């Protein structure tokens, strides 16, 4: 069962201002669409100012919805959100989709929008995509924010690896059995803890059902792509843009891998800064969008695209 083994190993890798209320028009208007070299991406742009591009994680297409409602971010920046291929209404290509492919889609979207340089924000596997773009096209990435990226930790021991594989095995058993809802729930519990569902249901009504519809994308395409992608220390040293590593304070209680990744980012990248969000787990920007928006805005202000 090579596929099952690969998926299990990859799961281990993944292991205040007043908020702005969106207008009725903003909440209900359809997303725009961009045709990019054979794929179509849904996207939305809010605000004006220096461009900020948000690259969402797997599972939920609308991870960033609460964040873009925050005036601290969209009141000061031109914020772009989009659905990656295989999620919601974006294209659903057959066959593998690599992290490099995803970075190419991101690059194409920026070109489509006339963005020459941006602050990139990647959550979980979205962080890997942002890093890939920074490696391939450093001129496009002014800063990179990594919100608990899905990085492989070279120092993880064999015993821990086996233990984490065993913990995730029921998730992949459920997926192979066709119980996509149980697979999605089990995976999210593994990376975010048991309280994630209440947070998601409150902030993103309907998101769990959409995640079940998108489950094939996540389990069949995204997880293998993340497993096959590697970041070496010498690669990280080439990324000289300012980096902000964001971690939820309660994430290490869910799995020690989150602290290991956070520390790895701070050690490997030449210009890395750290931010730990109190009372938060892997769903940190859904739990506390205002605090995350303020932290991002402060980081971007310290590193403006056009220095005064």
Each model region followed by its residue ranges:
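Bacterial N-terminal signal peptides
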Residues: 8-15
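Conserved HGGG/HGGXW glycine-rich cap/lid loop of the alpha/beta-hydrolase fold
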Residues: 35-92, 109, 300
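Conserved catalytic-core motifs of eukaryotic protein kinase domains, centered on the activation segment
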Residues: 64-66, 90-95, 155-157, 257
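Conserved loop-alpha-helix segment in the C-terminal half of the alpha/beta-hydrolase fold
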Residues: 69-72, 234-280
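Conserved hydrolase catalytic core segment
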Residues: 116-158
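Helix-rich cap/lid subdomain of alpha/beta-hydrolase
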Residues: 153-207, 220-227
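Catalytic active-site module of serine/aspartate enzymes centered on a nucleophile-bearing elbow/loop
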Residues: 269-308
């Amino acid at each position: 069962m090579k596929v099952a083994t690969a998926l299990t190993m990859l799961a281990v890798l993944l292991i205040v201002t007043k908020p702005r209320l969106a207008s009725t028009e903003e909440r209900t208007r359809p997303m725009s669409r961009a045709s990019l070299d054979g794929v179509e991406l849904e996207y939305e742009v809010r605000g004006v100012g220096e461009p900020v591009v948000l690259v969402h994680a797997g599972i939920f297409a609308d991870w960033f919805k609460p964040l873009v409602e925050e005036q601290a971010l969209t009141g000061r920046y031109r914020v772009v959100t989009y659905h990656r291929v295989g999620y919601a209404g974006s294209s659903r290509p057959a066959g593998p989709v690599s992290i490099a492919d995803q970075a190419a889609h991101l690059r194409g979207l920026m070109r489509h929008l006339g963005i020459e340089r941006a602050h990139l924000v990647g959550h979980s596997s979205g962080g890997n995509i942002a890093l890939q773009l920074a490696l391939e096209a450093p001129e496009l990435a002014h800063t990179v924010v990594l919100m608990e990226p899905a990085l492989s930790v070279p120092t993880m021991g064999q015993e821990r690896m086996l233990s984490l594989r065993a913990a995730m095995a029921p998730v992949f058993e459920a997926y192979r059995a066709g119980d996509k809802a149980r697979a999605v729930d089990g995976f999210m519990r593994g990376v975010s803890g048991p309280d994630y569902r209440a947070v998601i249901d409150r902030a993103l009504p309907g998101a769990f059902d959409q995640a079940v519809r998108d489950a094939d994308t996540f389990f069949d395409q995204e997880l293998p792509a993340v497993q096959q992608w590697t970041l070496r220390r010498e690669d990280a040293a080439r990324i000289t843009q300012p980096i902000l590593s964001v971690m939820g304070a309660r994430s290490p209680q869910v799995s020690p891998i989150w602290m290991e990744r956070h520390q790895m980012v701070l050690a490997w990248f030449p210009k890395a800064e750290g931010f730990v969000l109190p009372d938060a787990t892997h769903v940190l920007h859904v739990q506390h969008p205002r605090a995350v928006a303020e932290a991002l805005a402060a980081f971007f202000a310290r590193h403006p695209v056009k220095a005064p």
